[in-house]
Design a protein with these regions (language model features):
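Short juxtamembrane and helix-loop transition motifs at transmembrane-helix boundaries
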Residues: 9-10, 28-41
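Extended, low-polarity transmembrane helix blocks
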Residues: 1-27, 46-52, 56, 63-128
Length: 128
C-alpha cells in the first residue's frame, strides 16, 4: 500500500467533515429549519438540499472526481449561508445570539477558504 500525502490526507479529513455536516442536515432537519430565512419559500426543503450538497461534495472529494467543481460550488453555498443567515443574525437579536452568529460566520469563512484550497489544488499532483 502506498504512502498517502499530507495534501490528500487533508482533503480526506475535509471531506469527512463536510459529509458529517450533510448527515446532520438530513437527520436533524427539523431543528435546523429555524435558521432558514423566513423570506425563502421551501423551509425544510432547503435544509435537505444543503445536506445533500454537503454529502455530494464530500463524495466528490473522496473519490477525486469533479473535485474542483464540487469544492467551488461548496464554497458558493457557504458564502450564501454567510450572506443570508449569519450576517443578518449578527444584526439583530440578543448579544449572545449575535456572538454565536459571528462564530458561525467565522467557521464558514474558514470552510470557504478550505474549499477553495482543496478545489484549487485538486488537479495538481500529490507531492510528499
Amino acid at each position: 500500500m502506498g504512502k498517502i500525502s499530507k495534501h490528500r490526507l487533508a482533503c480526506i479529513v475535509f471531506a469527512i467533515i463536510m459529509g458529517i455536516f450533510g448527515i446532520f442536515h438530513l437527520f436533524n432537519a427539523s431543528s435546523m429549519v429555524n435558521v432558514v430565512p423566513k423570506w425563502l419559500p421551501g423551509g425544510i426543503l432547503w435544509v435537505y438540499v444543503t445536506g445533500v450538497g454537503f454529502i455530494l461534495a464530500a463524495i466528490a472529494i473522496l473519490i477525486n472526481v469533479q473535485t474542483k467543481l464540487a469544492c467551488y460550488l461548496l464554497a458558493v453555498m457557504l458564502l450564501i449561508f454567510i450572506g443570508t443567515i449569519h450576517v443578518p443574525a449578527m444584526m439583530g437579536g440578543d448579544p449572545i445570539s449575535r456572538q454565536l452568529a459571528m462564530l458561525m460566520m467565522l467557521k464558514d469563512v474558514g470552510l470557504v477558504m478550505a474549499a477553495f484550497l482543496v478545489g484549487y489544488n485538486s488537479d495538481k499532483p500529490d507531492e510528499e
